[in-house]
Amino acid sequence: MHDHSLHSGHDHGLGPGSFHDRGAPHARGDLRRRAFTVGVGGPVGSGKTALVLALCRALRDSRSLGVVTNDIFTREDAEFLVRNDALPAERIRAVETGGCPHAAIREDVTANLLALEELTEAHRPEILFCESGGDNLAAHFSRELADYTIYVIDVAGGDKVPRKGGPGITQADLLVVNKTDLATAVGADLDVMARDAARMRGDGPVVFAQVTRGVGVPEIAGHVLHAYRHAVGAPH
């Protein structure tokens, strides 16, 4: 019986963190219980749900997929994905986290684990996406929940966001800087963002994207597939 009471504490919630201290992905022997899981996190409005939709569209013809979304008090993100035909409705589940969305992906992952395991049992997906509720830069997925993590920030917050650090920015397996088309409008310098992201993440990968326009999506999907193949021991 899997212990759903696993808690990861706040060990990575203090300080900016670093990419090489992130708790690297590890081979997990129970992929039949819970399929390879990609955690998608980031602040409110950064484009997490749009990215999940884009990745479903990019991968659904070649891979069996499922999605679990997290919202504080609604099922809005799951309903958006169903409405936009990301996947058949039965492959999309919603978890209502209450007022503390980061706890559901880090301190007490019980509800998300159950939803992911139920999807795995019902549909035998190869890849699951777990989208967190919108939260701050300190929120980051527990490795008990996500085998691979993507953190989404957007240019609308200004070019200062990457250098603020926080575990999401420094320790996600992939950082996505979304909405690059807004840079001029908000006075953000993409070169500054690229430099600061590299400084905060070392050699951790960063993709600059316009998710709703498809820009950067193939590259992001490529990172996901590479991690999946590595996890299942398939040739890259």
Swiss-Prot record:
Its principal location? cytoplasm
Top-level taxon of the source organism:
Bacteria
Stretches for region Disordered: 1-26
Q: Name the InterPro entries on file.
A: CobW/HypB/UreG_nucleotide-bd (IPR003495), P-loop_NTPase (IPR027417), UreG (IPR004400)
Which compartments is it annotated to reside in?
Cytoplasm
- Here the disulfide bonds are none
Q: Is the keyword rRNA processing assigned to this protein?
A: no
Give any Gene Ontology cellular component. Answer: cytoplasm
Looking up SUPFAM superfamilies in the UniProt record yields:
P-loop containing nucleoside triphosphate hydrolases (SSF52540)
A biological process (GO) of this protein is: urea catabolic process
Q: Where do the annotations place GTP binding?
A: G42, P43, V44, G45, S46, G47, K48, T49
Similarity remark: Belongs to the SIMIBI class G3E GTPase family. UreG subfamily.
This one is known as Urease accessory protein UreG
Q: Where does this protein come from, organism-wise? A: Anaeromyxobacter sp. (strain Fw109-5)
